[in-house]
């Protein structure tokens, strides 16, 4: 059997289970992209490296295998740093493949010359440059580093002379003989002695306020965490992208009384979440100043970070599923009859009050639509188990977090750890590519829409049927009622016709001003997605909003 270097590399990726690649082609990687397609790998050509990098990044999260990004070198790689950073911060597996100058042109000012290996190696888990002699080793190492330990980013540099190398690799069958073709993350269990100490602490404080905080790092461990919550009747609070790991519909979910739940928590089990800005660094005044945080994580660097409580010494390192199972078994062994009292009465009352307030807001009618009215209309139209909802934008995303509960994991994606704007269409493309059988609904603010609107054409061309809802308040945070004179930095053009942008790019266009129009258009868009694999853009005109000072609401204001 003979094959070229490029063919061998593409075949190797396919044998490792790589089925989808996002990117933008150019010199010298066009031939590599063609070879990937010839070997059964789906290539999704995007319109901008930033959006492509976000798509590949999210694919690594939503599909449970490394996302793969193929781009040109130099400026193409620089444009893709957004998604690389996104995967690093979110701890998602990503393989970046970029073209580079021929070896003979290095240090001569070659075409798009950039020493990409040196640029990236201090920050990524692995970087390597392909030669005809090291294809198997570099590919295996890159993919293995992506998934082992804390998931992250690997980089493979593909010089132009590698792609142009046409000499057959005689008898190159090493993929089946020397290196394993199935890459599985290794996991380890927790320290049994620490599990015993955690159980003793819980039972010693069983009359105190106990809370489980669930992060997206525990997304693979839904079964084990549901068992813990339900067996011992423990209240829980999911972080935004952890919604659905335990059903939001559970009576033990305290999300609707988040602020109060944090303030009264005494013992806090943190499962796969970081004590960062999303959890207010684990400090007062958001939290009870006496709270004891016990962190469970597969990443040892997370343990003890921002944790100044006595629980830092009890942090559990290991696979979260194995650790939670060990906790359940040890709790049962030490006290087989114990069951926590559940959600406190004061929290139940606050949940009821806030849910009533939310429903009242959704039913209050004004001269123009607002976020609450729109979300209250869309919620019953969304089939939870067959829908992935991506939300992006400041108010758009914040209000969506309380308006769209879910009972299934990996059904809610948003700006995440980095609070990144620009992820919306890339994430939506990844979700549809990974799960074509599901509805993918993207709800964006009008500012967020502008970051990657051209990717609508990608969705149309690749038949990645999306339902895109633009919450158009003509501004960032809020619009301006009076557009005369100098406009503030937050202002955008009033009532832009984003629906017509979608139409120009091949999507169905809907322009919405009323609840009845919204209901009809959304249902029509979903049907077009399911039956004809068509993308739709629904431009919803909403009120500009309050003209008030902009503050970091997540950090400074109570949440529902």
UniProtKB/Swiss-Prot annotation:
Listed cofactors: Mg(2+); thiamine diphosphate
Keywords from the UniProt entry: Cytoplasm, Lyase, Magnesium, Metal-binding, Peroxisome, Thiamine pyrophosphate
Note on cofactor: Binds 1 Mg(2+) ion per subunit. Binds 1 thiamine pyrophosphate per subunit.
Binding annotation for thiamine diphosphate: 49
Motif mapping: Peroxisomal target signal 1 (PTS1): 558-560
Record localization: Cytoplasm; Peroxisome matrix
PROSITE patterns assigned: TPP_ENZYMES (PS00187)
Gene Ontology CC annotations of this record: cytoplasm; peroxisomal matrix; peroxisome
Enzyme Commission number(s) of this protein: 4.1.2.63
Coarse class of the protein's main subcellular location: cytoplasm
Protein's UniProt keywords contain ATP-binding: no
Pfam families: TPP_enzyme_C, TPP_enzyme_M, TPP_enzyme_N
Family that this chain belongs to: Belongs to the TPP enzyme family.
Record remark on domains: Peroxisomal targeting signal 1 (PTS1) is a tripeptide located at the C-terminus of more than 95% of all peroxisomal matrix proteins. The prototypical PTS1 is the terminal tripeptide SKL (serine-lysine-leucine) but the consensus of PTS1 is defined as [S/A/H/C/E/P/Q/V] [K/R/H/Q] [L/F]. However, this description of the PTS1 consensus must probably be expanded beyond the terminal tripeptide.
Protein name: 2-hydroxyacyl-CoA lyase
Species name: Saccharomyces cerevisiae (strain ATCC 204508 / S288c)
Gene behind the chain: PXP1
């Amino acid at each position: 059997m003979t094959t070229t270097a490029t063919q061998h590399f593409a075949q190797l990726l396919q044998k490792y289970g790589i089925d989808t690649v996002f990117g933008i082609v150019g010199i010298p990687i066009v031939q590599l992209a063609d070879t990937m397609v010839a070997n059964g790998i789906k290539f999704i050509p995007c319109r901008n490296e930033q959006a492509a990098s976000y798509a590949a990044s999210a694919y690594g999260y939503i599909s449970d295998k490394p996302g793969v990004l193929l781009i040109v070198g130099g400026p193409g790689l620089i444009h893709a740093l957004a998604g690389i950073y996104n995967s690093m911060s979110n701890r998602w597996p990503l393989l970046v493949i970029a073209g580079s100058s021929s070896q003979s042109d290095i240090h001569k000012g070659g075409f798009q010359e950039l020493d990409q290996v040196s640029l990236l190696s201090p920050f990524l888990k692995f970087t390597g440059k392909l030669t005809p002699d090291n294809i198997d080793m570099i590919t295996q190492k890159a993919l293995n580093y992506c998934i082992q330990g804390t998931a992250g980013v690997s980089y493979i540099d593909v010089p132009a002379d590698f792609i142009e190398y046409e000499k057959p690799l005689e008898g190159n069958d090493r993929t089946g003989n020397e290196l394993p073709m199935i890459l599985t993350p290794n996991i380890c269990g927790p320290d049994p002695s620490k599990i015993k100490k955690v159980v003793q602490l819980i039972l010693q404080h069983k009359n105190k306020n106990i809370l489980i905080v669930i992060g997206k790092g525990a997304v693979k461990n839904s079964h084990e965490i549901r068992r813990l919550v339900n067996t011992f009747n423990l209240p829980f609070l999911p972080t935004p992208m952890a919604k659905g790991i335990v059903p939001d519909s559970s009576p033990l979910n305290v999300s609707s009384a988040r602020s109060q739940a944090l303030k009264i928590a005494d013992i806090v089990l943190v499962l796969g979440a970081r004590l960062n800005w999303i959890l207010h660094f684990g400090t007062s005044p958001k939290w009870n100043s006496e709270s004891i945080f016990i962190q469970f994580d597969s990443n040892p660097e997370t343990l003890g970070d921002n944790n100044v409580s006595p629980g830092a010494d009890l942090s559990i390192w290991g696979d979260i599923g194995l650790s939670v199972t060990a906790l359940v078994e040890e709790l049962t062994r030490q006290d087989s009859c114990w069951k926590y009292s559940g959600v406190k009465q004061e929290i139940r009352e606050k949940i009821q009050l806030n849910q009533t307030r939310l429903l009242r807001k959704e039913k209050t009618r004004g001269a123009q639509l607002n976020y609450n009215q729109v979300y209250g209309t869309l919620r019953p139209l969304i089939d939870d188990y067959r829908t992935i909802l991506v939300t992006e934008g400041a108010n758009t995303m914040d209000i969506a977090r309380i308006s769209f509960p879910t009972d299934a994991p990996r059904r809610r994606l948003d700006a995440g750890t980095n609070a990144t704007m620009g992820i919306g269409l890339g994430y939506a493309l990844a979700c549809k590519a990974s799960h074509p059988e599901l509805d993918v609904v993207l709800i964006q603010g009008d500012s967020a829409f502008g970051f990657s609107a051209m990717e609508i054409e990608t969705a149309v061309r690749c038949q990645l049927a999306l339902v895109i809802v633009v919450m158009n308040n003509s501004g960032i945070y809020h619009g301006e009622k009076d557009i005369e004179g100098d406009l503030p930095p937050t202002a955008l053009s009033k009532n832009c016709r984003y629906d017509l942008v979608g139409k120009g790019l091949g999507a169905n266009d809907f322009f919405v001003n009323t609840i009845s129009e919204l209901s009809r258009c959304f249902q029509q868009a979903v049907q077009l997605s399911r039956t004809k694999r068509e993308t739709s853009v629904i431009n919803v005109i909403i009120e500009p909003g309050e003209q008030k000072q902009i503050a970091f609401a997540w950090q400074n204001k109570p949440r529902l």
